[in-house]
């Protein structure tokens, strides 16, 4: 029997870490060599002080040569996806070109590309791009939606009604300013060398706001041999009066024709930036009243949180498909499992008041949840002190847990979500 093929998998945390362990334990399956650190948890985040994409990629490329890697991958937005592309380039392995990753992840450059290839799906952007810790210049039209040119997890992304609100948003303390700079600088350094026309990533993008009544959706897909294909669309449901996600549901309620339009936009954008292989997810709004589809961004990586939803409802494994692409194999050849649910959801528990953050479930509550929901997936995300305060400052809320559940239909899903929330001692919203 031939030896299992080995791959490098970078910054595999949470959903990706679970998938890496599951796939790596499969008999006869590939074996994974992990690398990276948790940039939001101590002590791993101390490594951010000295992190350099090129140095990290060179070290991992040397490791890959020594271990005989057949592929490399990462779905980590902030650091991993670009690092995997750099390593694949150095080792001559399958993967997206680093310039394509840069073009998609630099939100200012990506917006300009989208305006050229799919203007009907692009939000209007103001030419002014202030940086963190800068005073907002004159001439900005309010209200506007503000987000970092290079960001992740909706950090520092929100609508601001006036100049005073924007100034408060950009007013960082010394530690916050340092952290924001360090999060972006490794990316900006590569961008200056490989995509200089994009401009500085240490900036904020100002876009036209979209009414809160307009729902958000996520198209997941993959590219192989230059062909762009869809996995499906996941619907976002938000907390009332906010853009904060309450849950994600699959399958989507969007008409098939609208889903096809989203795929067409993704195809044009990915072709324009030269993204030829890998997974992607396209975040977009769709306003049924005006029939307008507006792209938020296109991420050149798997939306890892949703992989479990596809496994439950369709019996397909997006993480396994990503591994196949990293090995230059056809993901469609992978076997499908029997679906176990008609609908599935990723429930996101948030607090909007620092004084109202519930404690994480203790051992008894976790055991009760496991007994009642053997199919359930529980991910507590507790924070305290400065990390908790930073969540409220940068995101406007604190995400303290996620639960995944499946059901035969949406009515049963709501019932199961209420029961699970009660067992965990967490607030239930639907």
Predicted regions and their residues:
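ATP-binding N-terminal substructure of ATP-dependent carboxylate-amine bond-forming enzymes
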Residues: 1-100, 116, 131-132, 328-329, ...
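A short beta-strand motif that forms the metal-chelation/ATP-contact edge
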Residues: 84-86, 291-301
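A conserved helix-loop-beta module that forms one wall/lid of the active-site cleft
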Residues: 85, 89-159, 163, 174-194
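Short, conserved charged micro-motifs
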Residues: 133-135, 166-168, 292, 354-360, ...
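Short, well-ordered beta-strand elements within core beta-sheets of diverse protein domains
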Residues: 158, 207-208, 399-407
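Phosphate-binding site of ATP-dependent enzymes
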Residues: 170-238, 261-264, 285-294
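Active-site "cap" helix and flanking loop/linker of ATP-utilizing ligase/carboxylase catalytic domains
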Residues: 261-282, 300-358
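Glycine-rich active-site loop/lid that clamps phosphate-bearing ligands
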Residues: 350-384
